[in-house]
């Protein structure tokens, strides 16, 4: 008998949570577990066509902020009969400021209630601290509602559930083979972007939002570009800060050097086109993009606050303090002033020479989606 779950956490932007969900549902046996998706967006969500092809229903609610009364009315009506339709609800969370999905699931007798943390901090706390206080209050109440707690990393679990909470770590696993270095994909994307084979291309994959620190990324690239005026940057993603970023790019005179792609569903080819991956996030749960970049055998330069649970290809994994500033980041990336454990960082090559297939290392580190999906499937089906 097929078990049916209600999934939350999908948005119109194909970010890390969305990537985790898609990696999971693509590898779970549909004859055992199927999913529907509860969303608060009028727009088409990421991967919606693929989800519908899998047989999923997309339950669209009126926006909570735009139409609060209509949202509440439709929301309550939907949950009233949800206990009869669903075997469980799987809530993907960035904070506990709002736990309505958990409380309404409990109230309406959905049997299995799962909370999965994908975040290790939240700079989105409002100035009055209301969201933070709500998060802390709900954290103390969580065991009244959620049957099972998952987290993408220990840091994400401690932030969401508390340091003494009983949670299980499920890594944001990927299809490692799909991200293995491919010269063919590299050539294809570079041709598409009109970037020559011997141009040094830096890049990142992430939303244009405060958490991902896009303004700092641009500042780092500005320093890199001063040293190498022929280099380019590709920012794969979209978000609310895009207009601000494009304005700043213009002010720096980097319109021809810094490219923003917008939202992309399949990012695998873009990693192949890059020569180095820059990732100065303010905080992360466990970033899928960093796992994907390592799977592509890219040199990765990242914030020193990101959990070492993400370290897979050690020789490509370089942490740099954010407070060092953009110039220090650029110098480290260029190999002028390595800060990684006192060792000089290797200079980033101009051409992708020696890129390897590191898929077995990704799998050995516990980031193989086949293994992770099987583990989750067992829980969702058997409990």
Q: Predicted segment positions?
A:
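Carbohydrate-associated surface elements
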Residues: 155, 173
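Aromatic "clamp/platform" in nucleotide-sugar-dependent glycosyltransferases that forms part
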Residues: 94, 263, 282
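N-terminal strand-loop element at the rim of the active site
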Residues: 3, 7-15, 19-70, 240-242, ...
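Active-site donor-binding acidic/aromatic loop of nucleotide-activated sugar
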Residues: 241-244, 254-264, 270
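A conserved mid-protein helix/loop that constitutes part of the nucleotide-sugar donor-binding site
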Residues: 15-23, 200, 204-223, 240-246
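Short hydrophobic beta-strand element within catalytic cores of glycosyltransferases
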Residues: 38, 290, 299-304, 309
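A short helix/loop element that forms part of the nucleotide-sugar donor recognition site in Leloir-type
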Residues: 74-77, 180-195
């Amino acid at each position: 008998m097929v078990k049916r779950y209600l999934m939350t956490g999908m948005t119109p932007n194909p970010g890390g949570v969305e990537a985790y969900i898609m990696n999971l549902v693509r590898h779970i046996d549909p004859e055992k577990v199927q999913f529907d998706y509860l969303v608060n967006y009028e727009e088409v969500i990421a991967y919606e066509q693929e989800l519908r092809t899998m047989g999923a229903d997309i339950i669209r609610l009126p926006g909570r902020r735009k139409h609060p009364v209509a949202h509440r009315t439709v929301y309550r009506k939907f949950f009233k009969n949800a206990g009869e339709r669903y075997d469980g609800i799987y809530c993907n969370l960035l904070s506990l400021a709002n736990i309505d999905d958990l409380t309404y699931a409990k109230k309406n007798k959905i049997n299995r209630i799962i909370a999965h943390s994908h975040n290790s901090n939240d700079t989105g706390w409002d100035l009055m601290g209301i969201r933070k206080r709500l998060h802390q209050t709900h954290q103390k109440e969580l065991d009244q509602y959620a049957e099972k707690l998952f987290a993408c990393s220990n840091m994400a679990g401690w932030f969401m559930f508390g340091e003494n909470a009983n949670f299980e770590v499920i890594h944001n696993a990927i299809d490692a083979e799909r991200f293995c270095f491919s010269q063919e994909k590299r050539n294809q994307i570079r041709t598409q972007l009109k970037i020559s084979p011997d141009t040094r291309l830096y890049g990142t994959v992430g939303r244009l939002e405060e958490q991902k620190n896009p303004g700092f990324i641009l500042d780092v690239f500005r320093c890199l570009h001063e040293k190498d005026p022929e280099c380019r940057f590709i920012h794969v993603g979209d978000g609310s800060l895009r207009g601000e970023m494009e304005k700043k790019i213009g002010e720096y005179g980097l319109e021809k050097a810094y490219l923003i792609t917008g939202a992309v569903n399949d990012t695998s080819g873009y990693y192949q086109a890059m020569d180095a991956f820059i990732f100065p996030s303010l905080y992360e749960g466990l970033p899928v993009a960093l796992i994907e970049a390592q799977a592509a055998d890219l040199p990765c330069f990242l914030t020193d606050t990101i959990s070492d649970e993400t370290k897979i290809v050690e020789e490509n994994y370089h942490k740099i303090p954010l407070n060092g500033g953009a110039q220090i980041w650029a110098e480290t990336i260029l190999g002028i002033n390595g800060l990684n454990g006192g060792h000089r960082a290797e200079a980033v090559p101009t051409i992708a020479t020696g890129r390897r297939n590191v898929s077995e290392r990704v799998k050995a580190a516990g980031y193989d989606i086949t293994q992770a999906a099987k583990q989750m499937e067992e829980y969702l089906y058997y409990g």
